């Protein structure tokens, strides 16, 4: 919902660019993409990603973020078994996660890789679940997984429901600026 294919127009002519609209929870779609394109790296950006939406429709987040990620992991793990040893050694699966899996940041301190997960919404719980699945594929199948925990990202083309665009649009429109909880949350921005 938040993506806009027009944002990719500057790379559409690249030989290694392919746009495929599909559902990562669909085994056949994933199998066909892997066979047709034989990627060296898979970066899993596919996610339902807005906390407020996860309150209204948590099952959609579980479907995409948990079931979809598990299907992508499973099908990719099956697929790489057909690759040469050299290709397997070079292959990477990058799971894009979120800092939300750690819960709320206190006014002092920061998160690290050893901070325990403490998700507080269906969104963060679904992303924590997908991270645990990715780790389990790494440990069980020696599957080459890297997990990143991005903080709040901001930049051109960001969907207007995200915090910075929402605050700017509301301020320019003389609308109320939403305050979450007691307004004491601390967030990192990239």
Over which residues does each language-model region extend?
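Donor nucleotide-sugar recognition loop
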Residues: 66, 185-186
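Glycine/proline-rich active-site loop of Rossmann-fold NAD(P)-dependent oxidoreductases
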Residues: 128, 153-166, 173-175, 179-184
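A conserved structural motif in NAD(P)-dependent oxidoreductases
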Residues: 188-190
């Amino acid at each position: 919902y938040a993506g806009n294919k027009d944002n990719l127009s500057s790379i559409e002519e690249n030989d290694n660019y392919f746009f495929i609209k599909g559902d990562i929870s669909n085994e056949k779609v994933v199998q066909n993409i892997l066979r047709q394109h034989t990627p060296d790296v898979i970066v899993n950006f596919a996610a339902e990603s807005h906390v407020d939406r996860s309150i209204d429709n948590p099952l959609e987040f579980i479907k995409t973020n948990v079931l979809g990620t598990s299907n992508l992991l499973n099908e990719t793990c099956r697929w790489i078994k057909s690759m040469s040893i050299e290709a397997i050694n070079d292959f990477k699966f990058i799971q894009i996660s979120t800092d939300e899996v750690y819960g709320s940041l206190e006014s002092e301190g920061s998160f690290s890789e050893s901070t325990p997960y403490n998700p507080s919404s269906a969104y963060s719980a679904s992303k924590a679940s997908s991270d645990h699945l990715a780790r389990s594929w790494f440990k069980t199948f020696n599957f080459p997984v890297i997990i990143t925990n991005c903080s709040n990202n901001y930049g051109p083309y960001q969907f207007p429901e995200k915090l910075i665009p929402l605050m700017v649009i509301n301020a320019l429109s003389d609308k109320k600026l939403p305050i979450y909880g007691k307004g004491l949350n601390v967030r990192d921005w990239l």
